[in-house]
């Protein structure tokens, strides 16, 4: 008996199904004939992938391409974990020094394919060593801002200097990096290096006490005092009030607006400068910490930094001895100790502290980023990471001189205290602890 065309088609379909079907790449189906073998193979692949994930010595074998394809079908989560570790190990081998996070990507840049910074055009002087190592023959070229190959970059900040500045009088100062914890700073043997100076200027965050929020009750008490003073002036008949009294009233109205604008949480997490003692305010508003000094209070020592003509001849860095909050001249520190080197004109008003870019010389860049909330033409704020001008202590900075005012107070007594009826502002900075830094050498003007 001959088979009909329909019978042949049915037999062909059954045969294909039993073989797993044409070009299908999925794992073999578990039919009664091969199901046990497929299950054993799948378990073996998962066991091999798990061993690869748990391996700490790098000795476990990787999956083959076919095994990876099978794993992606039978256990998607395990496959994703396997591929993640595989990429981490590849990055660790190729970019171990500059990528401590082992992601291979920084700011959406693949470090293996793209530059982590743009380029800058330069003309190198005949005596300058700028970029000479990487481009010995090119005196005019475009070079990466980093200026060094990836393998020579350092994720732990030990070779980073933010800026080196030669002032008009010829003295040299450097701006230090924001420090890591002093306990895990490297042990440097070359005491003449700028790296040794950076290590010397590390901030110990465990000792640093940042400001707490303002006392809300005391702030409200100051507001009530100002309200009482305004009411005393407003009681004066409009035909009798003098020009001086009108001006005084305007000052207290402005002071009220300032007090109302203060956010009690604004100083939280900041450290601020006591311009009289050249120390930091503690979290209670008292002056006392020598962990960080703002400004060029420690003389920059040319024997540490070297000059345009000679190299460094430094002895090991010497920490300063403080007298009444001011460091002595015996230290070999470079500029300011610790957090950020700052140079500014101190004062009790926002304008005096902030100044302008020219007056305050606040041109320091923190890791290449200049901190400003306004355009270059309009800005007045200092160019430091999270810099602010704040009232820090609970009541001393908040128009404390006008305490004790009552409805019966004499305007003459209030007028006598006018000059002290103000908010005292302080330059403050929010400390930053940098656990990982992806780029090695972020510099300012390092060459003569």
Curated annotation (Swiss-Prot):
Query: What EC number(s) has UniProt assigned to this enzyme?
Result: 3.4.21.-
Question: Which keywords does this Swiss-Prot/TrEMBL entry list?
Answer: Hydrolase, Protease, Serine protease, Signal
Q: Which cofactor does it need?
A: a divalent metal cation
Gene Ontology terms: biological process: proteolysis
Renumbered residue ranges of the record's region Disordered: 87-109
Provide the leader sequence positions: 1-20
Q: Which GO terms describe its molecular function?
A: serine-type peptidase activity
Q: What is the recorded function of this protein according to its Swiss-Prot or TrEMBL entry?
A: This enzyme is a chymotrypsin-like serine protease. Degrades a variety of substrates present in the skin and hoof of the sheep, including elastin, keratin, fibrinogen and collagen. It seems to play an important role in the pathogenesis of sheep footrot.
Assigned protein family: Belongs to the peptidase S17 family.
**Name of the protein described by the UniProt record:** Extracellular serine protease
- Can you name the source organism? Dichelobacter nodosus
Whichever gene encodes this chain, its name is prvA
